[in-house]
Every structure is written in C-alpha cells, then in structure tokens.
Amino acid sequence: MNTNSKEVLSLGVQVPEAWEELLTMKVEAKSHLQWQESRLKRSNPLAREIFRRHFRQLCYQETPGPREALTRLQELCYQWLRPHVSTKEQILDLLVLEQFLSILPKELQGWVREHCPESGEEAVILLEDLERELDEPQHEMVAHRHRQEVLCKEMVPLAEQTPLTLQSQPKEPQLTCDSAQKCHSIGETDEVTKTEDRELVLRKDCPKIVEPHGKMFNEQTWEVSQQDPSHGEVGEHKDRIERQWGNLLGEGQHKCDECGKSFTQSSGLIRHQRIHTGERPYECNECGKAFSRSSGLFNHRGIHNIQKRYHCKECGKVFSQSAGLIQHQRIHKGEKPYQCSQCSKSYSRRSFLIEHQRSHTGERPHQCIECGKSFNRHCNLIRHQKIHTVAELV
C-alpha cells in the first residue's frame, strides 16, 4: 500500500470522529442559540405581539398551498400562545385580552398595544390610569367653576339691593356717620363676616365709593383702609378670594411638551409624562413588575395576595386556587381517585388518566409541525422535534 493510500485510509478513520465532533459543536451552538431566543421571547412581550399579528394577518395567497398555510398558522399560533410553557388560564387570558383590545376605540387600541400588556388585568390598569390622568384637570376645573358661580350668585342680588355707585346717587351721599356706626354695630353680630365679605366683593366692581365726609376714593385707597386692625377678617377673606381666583386664572400653567396637555399642578404633569417616557418607578417586590403609578402597583399586589391564599401544610407549597391545593395534597395522602375503566389503573389527577387512556384509544393529539407525525404525549413530541433540529444542522 503506497503512501497516498495510507493517508486516505488514515483520513477515512479520522473523518467520522472529526465530523461527530463538528456535529456536536453545531448542536450545542444551536441549542444555546435557541435557549437565548426562547429566553428573549419569554422576557419580551413585544415578541408575542409580533407573532400574534402575523397569525392574524397571514394571507392564503402568501403560501404555496393549503397544507403550507395551515402549517404556518400552527407555527405562528404556537409561538404566540406558547402552550408548552403557558397554562390553560394564561392562554385563555391572552385570547380574552385580544378580544378586549379589539372592542376598544382605535386610538386606545394603539396606545394600549404600545405598552404591551401581558394580561387583561394589566390592560385595564393601564386604561384606568389613563382615565385618572384625563379626569384630574377636568375635576379641578369643575370645582373652580362651581366656586365662581356661587360667588357670582351672591354678588348679583346684593348689587341690586344696595347700589353704591355715583351714578345711582350722584348728589346725596348716603353713607353718614350714623350709618357708619350702625354698620359697626352690625359687624358685632354673627353675620358680620358674611356681610362684609359681600360688601368687599361689590366694592371691587365699583370704580369709586362714597366716603363719610363726601370724599371720593378709588380701589387702591379702599385697600389701604382695610389695613386697619378692625377689618382684619375682611382683609383675610379678601386674600383668600384672590388666591382662589388666581388659581382659576393660572389653570393649565404646567404644559406637556409632547402632546400639549395642560395641568394645574406639576405632580399631574409628572404623572402624565410617564405615558410618553414609559417610566415605571413603582416596582413590585414579589415579581419585579413595574408600574407608572402607585395605584397600578396597589392593584397588582392584590393578585399576589390572591395567589397566596392556599398553603400546603405538608410541604409549604402555595396555590392560587383550592382545587390546585386539593390535587396536590393527594400526593402526600396517596389518593388516586381517577381509575381507568379499561385496565383499572388509578391516578391522582384527571389529566394523567386522560393521557393514559390515549394508549387504549390510540389518540395522538400532539402533532409535529415539521413532518406531521403525531404523538400521544407532549414529551414524546419534544423528543421527536430534536431530530429535525439535528437534520437542519447537518
């Protein structure tokens, strides 16, 4: 045997080992890549939203034929709902969430989808926070307007009963020393504050007022005269009225640069801006989920409180529903109430019995989307899908 034959023979012996090593490296690399991809999909709700859109928007004309269209829909639905890692309740919640978003107005649909809620409860919390953001300025505006209307109603009847302007009485000043003393005596009664308050508001509307000695003075002179200690209560009430009117006139001074919405208080603007920035400073200590408002965190904590109601006394495991606790306790007690009518085998859970009965009926509900092969157990399908993964690498 010549040298070339020996080299070929030696290569023939070494090639399978090198090929096996290369194949192992490829399988490990792809497994790591799939693990990273699945981790990204689990941690990123936006990925599930993309799969949902593809699932809903797939056109028959985009596929080569009916089988390919059905297979593609199965793949997208599988990636969207993730039945291998999601419970029935979670899948049901996703379907309800989709229908809930579809009945919302289009403007709210887009806004809620941008925040990528993972459940219907999260979508409701987002909408409730948004409603509170929108209602706060309107509520304050209504309160100010109500105070303004009450103030005007008190001013109008008093102005009709006691005219004090020069036009109504140009030549005969009515405010004498006797009348001033009378007013002073009235001021000692329980109604003094209310009467003086109305006179003060009325005088603000009058350009000039008659003084006891017939001297005319304007609003500035009146304000100086109110500095007298005997009129302290009137001046204090006047300041309070001016502050209320100042708040009304200054309404909307805090404006959002993004959408132009105005708020009376800076705290309202700060809460509103979190909608645009996506900031969520309130974080749950249990699961790490964050919220833009404290009310959202408060409502979310109720979920954890509900989830921790049912404790197993044997091992300390926690369940959100009593049925889950009852099923779990059968493990400790050894109870197997579900019995197969074919072979009399017993199981602690009904799902185990259903899975066992497929061995008698021949039912295979778990189908591979790659080749169409069916299996009676989901674990067998997962084991089978590894064959396709290795084939793709080769």
UniProtKB/Swiss-Prot annotation:
GO MF, any single term: DNA-binding transcription factor activity, RNA polymerase II-specific
Keyword terms: DNA-binding, Isopeptide bond, Metal-binding, Nucleus, Repeat, Transcription, Transcription regulation, Ubl conjugation, Zinc, Zinc-finger
Domain SCAN box: 52-134
Gene3D superfamilies tied to this protein: Classic Zinc Finger (3.30.160.60), DNA breaking-rejoining enzymes (1.10.4020.10)
Entry's transmembrane regions: none
Protein localization: Nucleus
Ranges annotated as C2H2-type zinc finger: 254-276, 282-304, 310-332, 338-360, 366-388
A GO cellular-component term linked to this record: nucleus
Recorded superkingdom: Eukaryota
BP terms from Gene Ontology: regulation of transcription by RNA polymerase II
Record's keyword annotation contains DNA-binding: yes
SUPFAM superfamilies noted in UniProt: beta-beta-alpha zinc fingers, Retrovirus capsid dimerization domain-like
Pfam families per the UniProt record, alphabetical: SCAN (PF02023), zf-C2H2 (PF00096)
Position of the Glycyl lysine isopeptide (Lys-Gly) (interchain with G-Cter in SUMO2) cross-link: 26, 215, 238
Function description: May be involved in transcriptional regulation.
Family: Belongs to the krueppel C2H2-type zinc-finger protein family.
PANTHER family in the cross-refs: ZINC FINGER AND SCAN DOMAIN-CONTAINING (PTHR23226), ZINC FINGER AND SCAN DOMAIN-CONTAINING PROTEIN 9 (PTHR23226:SF15)
Protein's name in the database: Zinc finger and SCAN domain-containing protein 9
Organism: Homo sapiens
Upper lineage: Eukaryota, Metazoa, Chordata, Craniata, Vertebrata
Gene name of the record: ZSCAN9
